[in-house]
């Protein structure tokens, strides 16, 4: 019987990807000039942060999504492709945002080097959302998704800066929530057009983990765990940066212990589930992201890490409650990034009120309402644009894979040792 996989991407993929890359080169030629940074010490400090962020994006998220037994190559390579494409597009977008937010480009010149730092951290929501659709889409669809999501997140940044007056650090922390619900909405729409039983049967065998694939996913978790303090502190300075690093380590440590112990407790025979370790150990770092610079005592960060770990394990064990079963999301981004991100935002609001509250101080009330509005706006934009992106990716021109070819590397990669090609 012939393969049910759609026609070859030989024409569609090179034309789209190469044309997009040439367009980026031309835009860089006309818009991006020499970097104004002169001090070597400042250059090296920023470069170290960029290195950490790149390790998180390329190795951490790449290997984290490689746990599926027949989709390891595509998960790692496609995530890397999204990172490379997303950074270029976000740098160009950052140039236009810099012009929109600050028209005086002579007094405050655009710094491509600083933009690389912002662009790398801005691609993290893209990689988070990719966890919900990897294995169900091809590389052309991912490229389209990168462009739409990058522009949407750029619009959110403009709105948060100009309308809500939110700090860059908080905007980027909201990006975890935005990326999670954007990806979940896209995945929901893509699965909506398929019969439920057929979709589940197509995924049952291929989403299972093997020892080697699970080990690579654990390697990605370790990279994320080690360098997550760099994410939470990348856009902070001075004492706030130091507090963010310390508190992130505390929260990560506690969520790791919580995830391990609760995973054993939730199993009838006291065995640990590796999926819980992949995801729940990171929940503390995600939850502490927004309030990390406001936390003055380690115990607060540790309690937050404990709560985030419990929520993540609860989400993994009760998928119907956390919508994971409805959305058919085997990567678990909802209870790894979505719910812990919301917990972190709630904690940030509470700590902000406690730190700034004074008798008859209406400013803190107004600011809190504004912060809640900014988060709600990010979530709403994520779900609305995710729905539109799902509709766009469903168009047949992208030659999407059939459900029977979900989570299958053979649809995209050359395997010389196999006699039958797809």
Swiss-Prot record:
It is a multi-pass membrane protein. It is found in: Cell membrane. GO terms for cellular component: membrane; plasma membrane. It holds the Pfam family Ammonium_transp. Gene3D superfamilies: Ammonium transporter AmtB like domains (1.10.3430.10). InterPro entries: Ammonium/urea_transptr, NH4_transpt_AmtB-like_dom, RhesusRHD. The keyword Lipoprotein applies. The gene is Rhd. May be part of an oligomeric complex which is likely to have a transport or channel function in the erythrocyte membrane. Belongs to the ammonium transporter (TC 2.A.49) family. Rh subfamily. Keywords: Cell membrane, Lipoprotein, Membrane, Palmitate, Transmembrane, Transmembrane helix. One of its GO terms (molecular function) is ammonium channel activity. It comes from Rattus norvegicus (Rat). Palmitoylated. Disulfide bonds: none annotated. GO terms for biological process: ammonium homeostasis; ammonium transmembrane transport; erythrocyte development; multicellular organismal-level iron ion homeostasis. The chain crosses the membrane at residues 13-33, 43-63, 76-96, 113-135, 137-159, 170-190, 215-235, 244-266, 272-292, 294-314, 335-355, 372-392. Its main location: membrane. This is Blood group Rh(D) polypeptide.
């Amino acid at each position: 019987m012939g393969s049910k996989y759609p026609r070859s991407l030989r024409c569609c993929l090179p034309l789209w990807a190469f044309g997009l890359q040439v367009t980026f080169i031309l835009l860089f030629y006309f818009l991006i000039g020499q970097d104004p940074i002169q001090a070597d010490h400042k250059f090296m400090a920023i470069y170290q942060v960029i290195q950490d962020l790149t390790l998180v994006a390329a190795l951490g998220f790449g290997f984290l999504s490689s746990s599926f037994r027949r989709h390891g190559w595509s998960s790692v390579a496609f995530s890397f492709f999204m990172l490379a494409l997303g950074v270029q597009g976000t740098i160009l977008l950052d140039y236009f945002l810099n012009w929109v937010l600050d028209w005086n480009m002579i007094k405050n010149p655009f710094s491509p080097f600083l933009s690389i730092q912002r662009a790398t951290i801005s691609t993290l929501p893209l990689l988070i959302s990719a966890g919900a659709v990897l294995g169900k889409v091809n590389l052309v669809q991912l490229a389209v998704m990168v462009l739409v999501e990058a522009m949407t997140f750029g619009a959110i940044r403009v709105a948060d800066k100009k309308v809500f007056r939110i700090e860059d650090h908080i905007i980027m922390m909201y990006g975890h929530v935005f990326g999670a619900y954007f990806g979940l909405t896209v995945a929901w729409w893509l699965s909506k057009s398929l019969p439920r039983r057929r979709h589940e049967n197509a995924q049952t065998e291929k989403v299972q983990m093997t020892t080697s694939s699970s080990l690579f996913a654990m390697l990605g978790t370790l990279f994320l765990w080690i360098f997550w303090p760099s994410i939470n502190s990348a856009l902070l300075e001075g004492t706030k940066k130091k507090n963010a690093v310390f508190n992130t380590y505390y929260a990560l440590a506690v969520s790791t212990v919580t995830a391990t112990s609760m995973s054993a407790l939730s199993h009838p025979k006291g065995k640990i589930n590796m999926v819980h370790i992949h995801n729940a150990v990171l929940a503390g770092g995600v939850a502490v992201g927004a309030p990390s610079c406001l936390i003055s005592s380690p115990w607060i960060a540790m309690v937050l890490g404990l709560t985030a770990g419990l929520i993540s394990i609860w989400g993994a064990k009760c998928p119907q409650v956390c919508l994971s079963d409805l959305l058919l999301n085997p990567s678990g981004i909802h209870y790894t990034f979505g719910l812990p991100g919301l917990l972190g935002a709630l904690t940030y609001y509470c700590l902000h009120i406690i730190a700034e509250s004074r008798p008859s101080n209406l400013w803190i009330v107004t600011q809190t309402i504004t912060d809640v509005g900014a988060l709600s706006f990010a979530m709403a934009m994520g779900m609305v644009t995710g729905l539109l992106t799902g509709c766009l990716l469903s168009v047949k021109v992208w030659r999407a894979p059939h459900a029977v070819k979900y989570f299958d590397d053979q649809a995209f990669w050359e395997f010389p040792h196999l006699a039958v090609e797809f």
